[in-house]
C-alpha cells in the first residue's frame, strides 16, 4: 500500500505546484481544496482515515484531519496549507515549481510551510502504523496567513484531546513554547466640521483623538507595570500607534480622525481582559463625547501562547534535541491548538525565509526533521 506514495521530492514538488494562496483581497485569495484532497489521498494511501472539513466563514477553504490508531491521547502533528501571495517582480524563479539548487529547495511554501507535510508523509512510509499504541493525528489547516480560521474552527469544534501537538512552522528545528499575541485596532472619532473662525460650532476630532491617545498612553504604562514575562527580550506587552489620519485643511474644524494601533499581549493576558482594559481606558472620552468614539478590529485578534516549561512535551523534545525551548516574537496557530492540548512549535526551515522572494528550505534539514518526526511518533504513540 505504501508503495503508492511518491518519493519525498515528488511529494514536495506536487505540494508546491498546487497553489493555495490566502489573502484578505478576494482577487488574490484561493481555495485550498485541491491541496487538501491531494494530502488526503496520500494519507489514505498510508492507511489513515481522513476527514475533510469545510471551514465556516471562509471562501471555500477546508481543514483535513487524518487519524491512525485508536484510544485516548496520542500525538497531533499540525500545519497550515496556505501560503502568502508572492511578488512576481522579486522572484527569480517560478514560485510554483520546486527548484533544487546549491543544497536548497526553492518555491512558495517550501519553508512556510507546505513542505512540513512532505516530511511527515516521507517519514511515516517507514513506520508500521498498526503497531501504534496511541493515535496519531495529522491536521492540515486553512487561512493561517490571514484569519487563522482553520485552526480556530478546529479548536472550537473538535472533541479530540491528544496528549500533545507539534506545529511544524519553520523554527530551524528550535523548539518554541511561547509567543506574544497580536491585536490591531482602528480608533475612530466622528467630530463635527465647521469653519475654524467659529470653534464653538464644531467638534474637533483631532482634539478628541488627542484625549484618546493620552488615555491609551496611560494604559501602555499600566500594561508595562502590571504584566511581565522574563522569557521575552521585551518582557512586557507593547503598544504602538502606527498610523493616524484626520482633517483636510488648516482652516476647517476636523470632522473625522482615525488612529491605527496595535498591542502585543503576553501569554496569560486574555483577549477579553485586554478588550476590557482598552474600553476602560477610552471610557472617559466616550462619556464626555457620547457616540463619537468607536473601536474596530483591523485584523482578527491572536492571543498570546505558552506551553508550561514543566510539561512532559517540553521535557521530551528538549531531551531529544539537546536544546532548550525558546520564546519568539512572531505569531502562529499555537494559541488555538493549545486550547485542545499542550503544543510546541517546531519545524524545518528558517523563519527568515518565510514570506520572502525566492523562499527556500536548506536540504540540511531533511535528515534531522525525518529523525525528529520518527522519534516523537515513537515516543508519544508507542508508549
Swiss-Prot record:
Its main location: cytoplasm. Pfam families: M20_dimer, Peptidase_M20. Pathway: Amino-acid biosynthesis; L-arginine biosynthesis; L-ornithine from N(2)-acetyl-L-ornithine (linear): step 1/1. It comes from Erwinia tasmaniensis (strain DSM 17950 / CFBP 7177 / CIP 109463 / NCPPB 4357 / Et1/99). InterPro entries: AcOrn-deacetyl, ArgE/DapE_CS, Bact_exopeptidase_dim_dom, Peptidase_M20, Peptidase_M20_dimer, Peptidase_M20A. Keywords: Amino-acid biosynthesis, Arginine biosynthesis, Cobalt, Cytoplasm, Hydrolase, Metal-binding, Zinc. It is found in: Cytoplasm. The keyword Chloroplast does not apply. Its EC number is 3.5.1.16. It is an enzyme of class 3 (hydrolase). One of its GO terms (molecular function) is acetylornithine deacetylase activity. Zn(2+) 1 binds at residues 80, 112, 169. The active site is at residues 82, 144. Zn(2+) 2 binds at residues 112, 145, 355. Homodimer. It catalyses: N(2)-acetyl-L-ornithine + H2O = L-ornithine + acetate. Its cofactor is Zn(2+); Co(2+); glutathione. GO terms for biological process: L-arginine biosynthetic process. Belongs to the peptidase M20A family. ArgE subfamily. Binds 2 Zn(2+) or Co(2+) ions per subunit. GO terms for cellular component: cytoplasm. HAMAP family: ArgE (MF_01108). This is Acetylornithine deacetylase. CDD domains: M20_ArgE. Catalyzes the hydrolysis of the amide bond of N(2)-acetylated L-amino acids. Cleaves the acetyl group from N-acetyl-L-ornithine to form L-ornithine, an intermediate in L-arginine biosynthesis pathway, and a branchpoint in the synthesis of polyamines.
Amino acid at each position: 500500500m505504501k508503495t503508492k506514495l511518491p518519493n519525498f521530492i515528488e511529494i514536495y514538488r506536487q505540494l508546491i505546484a498546487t497553489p493555495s494562496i490566502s489573502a484578505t483581497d478576494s482577487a488574490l485569495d484561493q481555495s485550498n481544496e485541491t491541496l487538501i484532497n491531494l494530502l488526503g489521498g496520500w494519507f489514505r494511501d498510508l492507511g489513515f482515515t481522513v476527514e475533510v472539513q469545510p471551514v465556516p466563514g471562509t471562501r471555500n477553504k477546508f481543514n483535513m484531519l487524518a487519524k491512525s490508531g485508536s484510544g485516548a491521547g496520542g500525538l497531533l502533528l499540525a500545519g497550515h496549507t496556505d501560503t502568502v501571495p508572492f511578488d512576481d517582480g522579486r522572484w527569480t524563479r517560478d514560485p510554483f515549481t520546486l527548484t533544487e539548487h546549491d543544497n536548497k529547495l526553492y518555491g512558495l511554501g517550501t519553508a512556510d510551510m507546505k513542505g512540513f507535510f512532505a516530511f511527515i508523509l516521507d517519514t511515516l512510509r517507514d513506520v508500521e502504523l498498526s503497531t501504534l499504541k496511541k493515535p496519531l493525528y495529522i491536521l492540515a489547516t486553512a487561512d493561517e496567513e490571514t484569519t487563522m480560521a482553520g485552526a480556530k474552527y478546529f479548536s472550537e469544534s473538535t472533541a479530540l484531546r491528544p496528549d500533545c501537538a507539534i506545529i511544524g512552522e519553520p523554527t530551524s528545528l528550535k523548539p518554541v513554547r511561547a509567543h506574544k499575541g497580536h491585536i490591531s485596532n482602528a480608533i475612530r472619532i466622528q467630530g463635527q466640521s465647521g469653519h475654524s473662525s467659529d470653534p464653538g460650532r464644531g467638534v474637533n476630532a483631532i482634539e478628541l483623538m488627542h484625549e484618546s491617545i493620552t488615555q491609551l498612553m496611560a494604559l501602555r504604562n499600566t500594561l508595562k507595570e502590571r504584566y511581565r514575562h522574563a522569557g521575552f527580550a521585551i518582557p512586557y506587552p507593547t503598544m504602538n500607534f502606527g498610523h493616524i489620519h484626520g482633517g483636510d485643511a488648516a482652516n476647517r474644524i476636523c470632522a473625522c480622525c482615525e488612529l491605527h494601533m496595535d498591542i502585543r499581549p503576553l501569554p496569560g493576558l486574555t483577549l477579553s481582559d485586554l478588550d476590557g482594559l482598552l474600553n476602560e481606558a477610552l471610557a472617559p472620552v466616550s462619556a464626555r463625547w457620547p457616540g463619537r468614539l468607536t473601536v474596530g478590529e483591523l485584523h482578527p485578534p491572536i492571543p498570546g501562547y505558552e506551553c508550561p516549561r514543566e510539561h512532559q512535551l517540553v521535557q521530551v523534545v528538549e531531551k531529544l534535541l539537546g536544546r532548550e525551548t525558546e520564546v519568539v516574537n512572531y505569531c502562529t496557530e499555537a494559541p488555538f491548538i493549545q486550547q485542545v492540548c499542550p503544543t510546541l512549535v517546531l519545524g524545518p526551515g528558517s523563519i527568515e525565509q518565510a514570506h520572502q522572494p525566492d523562499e527556500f528550505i536548506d536540504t540540511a534539514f531533511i535528515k534531522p526533521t525525518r529523525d525528529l518526526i520518527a522519534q516523537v511518533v515513537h515516543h508519544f504513540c508507542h508508549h
